[in-house]
Amino acid sequence: MLILGHPLIPSDRFIFIKNTDGIHSSTNNDIVCFEAHPKNLELAKYCCENGVHFSVIFLSHKIETDTFFLFNAFKPLYCIFKDIKQAILAQQHATNYLLDSKILFSMDLNDTELWEICAKNQIDGVISKDSLL
């Protein structure tokens, strides 16, 4: 299981962006991230075509299956979910369709119950909710 954002475990820095200007102000080691909204598909395409490492954050409590697969066509490093039920469903899709993107659940890393749920459902990884401000 990947663990991102833990103070004792080194990980890349996530930078929330809204447009390509945000990409230009990031460093090569940063992972840019943005909301999984259909209006951001162009941003995902830009990242894919220009070799920019990016992640997509699914904020909704209801995953839009078409949006999930459309964003995955542009090969994000991570698909980050704030809702555990959506993370579990996305993980099933990622496993069944052999997607390259890793599924992460954004959580309080001190919540032992959520760790158990993630492990039981074989979620690829977790990320501290504090890493995504």
Language model features: what each stretch is:
Residues 4-6, 15-22, 30-39, 52-63, ...:
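Catalytic beta/alpha-barrel core
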Residues 27, 74, 121:
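Structured loop/turn residues at beta-strand edges in well-structured enzyme cores
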Residues 45-48, 91:
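Residue-level detector of alpha-helical secondary structure
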Residues 112-121:
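Catalytic cores of alpha/beta
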Residues 131-133:
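C-terminal helical cap(s) of enzyme catalytic domains, especially alpha/beta-barrels
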